[in-house]
Amino acid sequence: MVREEVAGSTQTLQWKCVESRVDSKRLYYGRFILSPLRKGQADTVGIALRRALLGEIEGTCITRAKFGSVPHEYSTIAGIEESVQEILLNLKEIVLRSNLYGVRDASICVKGPRYITAQDIILPPSVEIVDTAQPIANLTEPIDFCIDLQIKRDRGYQTELRKNYQDGSYPIDAVSMPVRNVNYSIFSCGNGNEKHEILFLEIWTNGSLTPKEALYEASRNLIDLFLPFLHAEEEGTSFEENKNRFTPPPFTFKKRLTNLKKNKKGIPLNCIFIDQLELTSRTYNCLKRANIHTLLDLLSKTEEDLLRIDSFRMEDRKHIWDTLEKHLPIDLLKNKLSF
């Protein structure tokens, strides 16, 4: 695609998946192109997407394992071929797929002799295993073997200090990085002032999500990162009138909690879960990540608390309040604050 002029192209950017394949259960590959881009834009987009794909995509993994009567992680257990450390390393490699937030419990409880694989993990309903054949341990004798596990959804690489826990549990260095690798290349075409660039993007994932899903999530995260600048202008922020500092419009949920209690003392706020409020999936996930599970949790937060939540946007707060006004059987309009 060729632009008529460099400074003001009327052509719309288009992207396309040109190749997609599954090399194994834990290795997906996708190749995408984006064009036409002006000179330098492909590098800007490529760098931003690569960083977002490798560092901002959330993944689910096992973060802790608890053994019974094991003095330290370098111990061996009678009747098991692998040491405790080797079992922990095998658990670290297990690839999980889920949309859960917070910590969940799982377990393994089997009787030998037999091989233990990922298929033997007893998981909560919201979690599934990508490759059930992943090895964990080999029981060589007829023994009962049980492990309690903790599962968490996070992003990036999380490490914990190694120490002996009295309850027999050991932390696992969690690698919550579903995207295994990202490459990008740039192809220039056209002549003279009609030159433009094509961005080629290659993505490899661990099978917990497809490269296309990873690209969508990374793009969404980048958009959310820049939205505050757009909303500042939309809300009429005047930097000339506020030369010294910027004060966001007042929005304190604590005041509304007081009003709520005044108008409807009988409402059990701690029994109303945010799942019942018909929030968008994006807003719901933001709140769950911040351990906000009930209406009481939500209404106890200030605007500053909410805006500190990762990926929480200005428009999310308005959506939350609009939803409360629509569905709660009380008159909250009296103390409603303007946006």
From Swiss-Prot:
Subcellular location: Plastid, Chloroplast
Top-tier EC class: transferase
Gene3D superfamilies in the cross-refs: 5' to 3' exonuclease, C-terminal subdomain, DNA-directed RNA polymerase, insert domain, RNA polymerase, RBP11-like subunit
EC number: 2.7.7.6
Gene Ontology cellular component list: chloroplast; DNA-directed RNA polymerase complex; mitochondrion
Pfam family, one: RNA_pol_L
Function: DNA-dependent RNA polymerase catalyzes the transcription of DNA into RNA using the four ribonucleoside triphosphates as substrates.
UniProt-recorded name of the protein: DNA-directed RNA polymerase subunit alpha
Species: Thinopyrum elongatum
